[in-house]
């Protein structure tokens, strides 16, 4: 259920603000969004996988906190990110 290394690197490359950037909120939110999408698909098939459900809820909460941080620090970057990711906020 973990992200494939190539997929993760492509996400990092797409959302990085500078070369080698892996810690910016944009990159972290993009990686979390992909993991959330993957786990959501897993949960559609395995409805009773409560350990995964708990991890999924933790990731959603972490992404929500990062988006909130980004919204409070730089609203333009926040709006651009949710537009690129297709998130509803």
From Swiss-Prot:
GO annotation terms (biological process): translation
Domain of life: Bacteria
SUPFAM superfamilies: S15/NS1 RNA-binding domain
One GO CC term on file: cytosolic small ribosomal subunit
Any one GO molecular function term: structural constituent of ribosome
Keyword terms, alphabetized: Ribonucleoprotein, Ribosomal protein, RNA-binding, rRNA-binding
Keyword RNA-binding annotated: yes
InterPro entries recorded: Ribosomal_uS15, Ribosomal_uS15_bac-type, uS15_NS1_RNA-bd_sf
Family, as annotated: Belongs to the universal ribosomal protein uS15 family.
NCBIfam families (alphabetical): S15_bact (TIGR00952)
Quaternary structure and partners: Part of the 30S ribosomal subunit. Forms a bridge to the 50S subunit in the 70S ribosome, contacting the 23S rRNA.
Functional note: One of the primary rRNA binding proteins, it binds directly to 16S rRNA where it helps nucleate assembly of the platform of the 30S subunit by binding and bridging several RNA helices of the 16S rRNA.
Protein name from the UniProt record: Small ribosomal subunit protein uS15
Naturally occurring in which organism (per UniProt): Paenarthrobacter aurescens (strain TC1)
Name of the coding gene: rpsO
